[in-house]
Amino acid sequence: MKLTFLGANHEVTGSCTLLEAAGQRYLIDCGMEQGKDVYENQPFPVAPGEIDGVLVTHAHIDHTGQLPLLVRNAFRGRIYATKPTAQLCSIMLRDSAHIQEFEAEWKNRKAKRAGAEPVEPMYTVQDAEAAMQLFRGMEYNTKIELAPGLVIRFIDVGHLLGSSSIEIWVTESGATTKLVFSGDIGNQHQPIIKDPTTIRDADYVFMESTYGDRSHGPRPDYVGELSRILQRTFDRGGNVVIPSFAVGRTQELLYFIREIKKEGLVTGHGNFPVYIDSPLAIEATRIFKDTDPDCFDEDTRALLAQGIDPIQFPGLQVSVTSDESRMINADRVPKVIIS
């Protein structure tokens, strides 16, 4: 058995580890380095065509963003992820590919003026769509034999819808070794998704530790603080603009705002409008709505059992096109804009 750390070992992004065991080569995650020019990402140190498969912990781009590049370079194995992760990757990888194409087009306009050589995008939308054809949606808590001597299991880790730690059992020369790749570990008591599952035993654990030495203190009163901000801003005729990650954070905000409206915590403004001004966030919200309720926490499942959509409420509107986004500016009613 051999492990090679290809990313995120001296930095936060670009998670990617090569496991060579039981005659197989598997990547655990295949993330994009972020925070610098993506064209400076290094080529794979192992030929993509020689990789048997990829195990994905969750859909964030720093864990999945190079999957289309892997496929572009002749990878034809399977990509294993939970079903919600596969669904989220279908929109996030396509969105990332659009960005790669746009960035390449912008660089080439500059290159043409300077007489420089054109550049190719890291990957294209076509590459992202090809990568999605290789995904296999897995259930939580179910052991899967990838090959003789190589067994895996996805365990809910409460970071993002579909996120997981991956347990791997490697059997070689009659001895079995258990590895755990933590993925990103979520906090307790987050809305919508379940709390992280505790894994009881392992021979080796490889874990994310970005916040490993931080004491976060008591959980903030998000609903109370947000309702006070909304009340104060609406009372003076203003709008509340919330920049938000499209996947995960936007849905948490919708959950909190539904509770604020239900409890009447903002007074004098009726069913104030809330706009989702992000096509990616709109698609992600649809995936949340279509996900198996078993992926959600007890409170969310209880709402669904009563026929209550936990991230839907009166006054929620979406803007998909640029014209619809511009129309928000013409609406003088105090509102929330999530973008």
Model regions and ranges:
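His/Asp/Glu-rich metal-coordinating catalytic cores
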Residues: M1-L55, T64, V71-E252, R258-T267
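Hard-cation-handling environments
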Residues: I229-S339
